[in-house]
Amino acid sequence: MDSSTTIPITPTRTPCFFNISSSFNEHSPLNFYDEPIYNFSSGHEENQSHKSSKLTFFKPSNTKRSPHTPMQNNAKAIRLSTTVRHGIFKNSDLDGCSKPFAFSSGLKLSKKIVDASTPIDLKRKRAVTSLSTGLLSKREKWSLWEGNLTNPRSEQPHTPCKKGTKIKLKPPQSPLSPTTSLLARKCKHIDLDTFSRLDHPNSDSSDETFEMEELPSLSYGSEDLLEFCETPCKSQPIFLSSSHVNNWDEKDVPSSLSWTPTSPIFLNINSADDYEEEEDWTSDLRIRFQQVKPIHESDFSFVYHVSSINPPTETVYVVKMLKKNAAKFTGKERHLQEVSILQRLQACPFVVNLVNVWSYNDNIFLQLDYCENGDLSLFLSELGLLQVMDPFRVWKMLFQLTQALNFIHLLEFVHLDVKPSNVLITRDGNLKLGDFGLATSLPVSSMVDLEGDRVYIAPEILASHNYGKPADVYSLGLSMIEAATNVVLPENGVEWQRLRSGDYSNLPNLKDLLLSKEKVQINKVRCAESLQCLLQRMTHPYVDCRPTTQDLLAMPEMIFISEHSQKAAIIYEDHNSWLET
């Protein structure tokens, strides 16, 4: 790695205070400078019971801002959607906290108030945590998104990938009016999406008109096409982006007729009968099920939340419809292979169960078990706003997902898209691996071009199309690094390259995260050290240096987890021993 490369700077943060309504006086807030949430000394925890109350944020007006403390937007409170609430905190709903409802900030700060002009105390050793690295933590990302409307990741340089473009399927869109198109070409500081929703003199006021949505495009005759040719990557849609326009002058429209059009050309690749076909398959779903609700749409599928048609034995399922148009780009054989793989994996308790499959109007429907607690990505994002996950819980999640991958690999399949958003959480808090859209059998043909999420993709897939079992181990290791360190993994750029080259210098040390707290037991430090060592082996740049799933399950740590774990994967549980007989 070039030593002159500039490390991304962590954005300035300001203080944030938590308050639980009906528990404390709002004029006496508990702040981040108090004691941490966890007290790891056994036998010294106070068994307190607190009534559940609404979690809100506020910022006292008499408090000075500090550049070292994260701030939450006081206009919005955190909304935890995961129903297994007690799995987030220690001893169910914050029992055992040294101070009730005092959340740890992840930084061990002094109680003095500092600002941007305060000199740095060089004698005091700074704590190495997830908030002091070049990578953003989940809490920092949330604060950055609240303060900025744009995605901070989009400003990073692109990461070279083997695919030149990614076609995104969209429903048919209403065409732009001539006035809107001309103004979009002339006004450089106009947002096309915002302007298309303004009231125009000749616009149709009917409620049935479609809203304009941006489609993937290229600006022919401009620099966009040159950038696309110079850097091969998964291209993102290119649109006009600038400040919002509140008013405009109609008399400026004719003068734009003589301008050379350089605005994006929007192309619609869907047929005009897509809406009629959607009505056909939804009507078929309503015949088979009741309470059919769409919950998600991706490039190649629709996902519906349905329930059985017999009320006495009502059961909730998820129906995934593989789009017919998607088969033109991925091949119908890919859809049939996904069905075949899911049918072979029905015996594994850590893989989403396929209940039924059928075809209607050339569209394939998959009926799957419903996981009530959403996906692991959502759980990590919500937990990351409050605290860093304890290493023992990460071990439990790693154990369950390793069993899922081991079952898949024994049948000579590879998943190729392991990431937290494809890991589902059941009602009791256990994990199941889903989304086998990229899964395939081994050996993978050289003609096959498969590529998962670039955040979790293994380096050998991009370098030499080497699809194998180690690629799944690498993606699982990165997913567990995200869970253990509470950082936002980079999509591209310098940090992306460092992780693929085995450079973990900007990742927080799990041992230091524990030592920043008081009264940490030695067994917990050993648990964190062994976890960090294993995750670095799983994400090794060289394929031969990574352990297999069978090697992982044979480790003493995995055997200890299988014998001593009493609760589900995402539920906190305290152990006074680690690898002790």
Curated annotation (Swiss-Prot):
UniProt-listed SMART domains: S_TKc
Polar residues biased stretches: 59-71
Keywords associated with the record: ATP-binding, Cell cycle, Cell division, Kinase, Magnesium, Metal-binding, Mitosis, Nucleotide-binding, Serine/threonine-protein kinase, Transferase, Tyrosine-protein kinase
Any one GO molecular-function label of the UniProt entry: protein tyrosine kinase activity
Active site: 417
Keyword field contains Glycosyltransferase: no
Enzyme class: transferase
EC number: 2.7.11.1
Ranges for domain Protein kinase: 289-561
Gene3D superfamilies listed in its UniProt record: Phosphorylase Kinase, domain 1, Transferase(Phosphotransferase) domain 1
Sites where the protein binds Mg(2+): 422, 435
Reactions it catalyzes: L-seryl-[protein] + ATP = O-phospho-L-seryl-[protein] + ADP + H(+); L-threonyl-[protein] + ATP = O-phospho-L-threonyl-[protein] + ADP + H(+)
Record field: compositional bias (Basic residues): 160-169
Region (Disordered): 43-71, 148-178
Record GO cellular component, one term: nucleus
Positions bound to ATP: 295-303, 320
Gene Ontology biological process terms from the UniProt entry: cell division; negative regulation of G2/M transition of mitotic cell cycle; negative regulation of G2/MI transition of meiotic cell cycle; signaling
PANTHER family membership: EUKARYOTIC TRANSLATION INITIATION FACTOR 2-ALPHA KINASE EIF2-ALPHA KINASE -RELATED, MITOSIS INHIBITOR PROTEIN KINASE MIK1
Summary of the function given for this chain in its UniProt record: Protein kinase that acts both on serines and on tyrosines. It acts as a negative regulator of entry into mitosis (G2 to M transition). Phosphorylates and inhibits cdc2.
Family that this chain belongs to: Belongs to the protein kinase superfamily. Ser/Thr protein kinase family. WEE1 subfamily.
Record-given protein name: Mitosis inhibitor protein kinase mik1
